[in-house]
Amino acid sequence: RRDALDMARTTANRALTATVLRAGLQIQAWREEQAAPETIRRLAQLNRDLLDALCGLLAQSDEFSMAASLRRLEEAAPLGGVAPALNPHTELTLKGNAENEYCRSHHYELAAYVYRKETAAFWDDILARVEAGDRAEWPFPSELAAQAKAIEDEFYATPLAQMAPQATRGPAELADALRGLAALVGALREQVEPSRLK
């Protein structure tokens, strides 16, 4: 089970990266009037769907949940007759260690409550520019930095218990999650065929 989840997480992560890279190529081709806006829209939706699939995979195990880690710390047994005392800043520390920019990873709470919102803001900005026919080079929009800060603040203000995965877990659910990811990777492969460049 753990091996399957690890391979699937890696596959999802690589596919997410591939959709963004492919979209970058398609945006440049669109600027040069060599690609249709629909191609960019499809890649944006595929990227969002892949992130949802990653969330579904992460929800299948407590190993990827900060809420579960905190719960295990709270339930720790005494050691040598000494009851453990949980630092009141433990939850904030868990969040900070996971959310900082240089070591973000596959934590369910981050994927579901930070990455999804950041991804939505990213694609909303790009698709708005495409819909407006803005073919100029795009500077990094200051609005995205403000949105990222608001998303971060909301994440820190929301208790981990409220963000914990609620998915039903079992062999059938894991198989469904893996099949869903496989279908999305198949859709991505169709997008990267040389004939699909335009």
Regions found by a protein language model. Give the residues of each.
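Catalytic domains of carbohydrate-active enzymes that cleave complex glycans
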Residues: 1-198
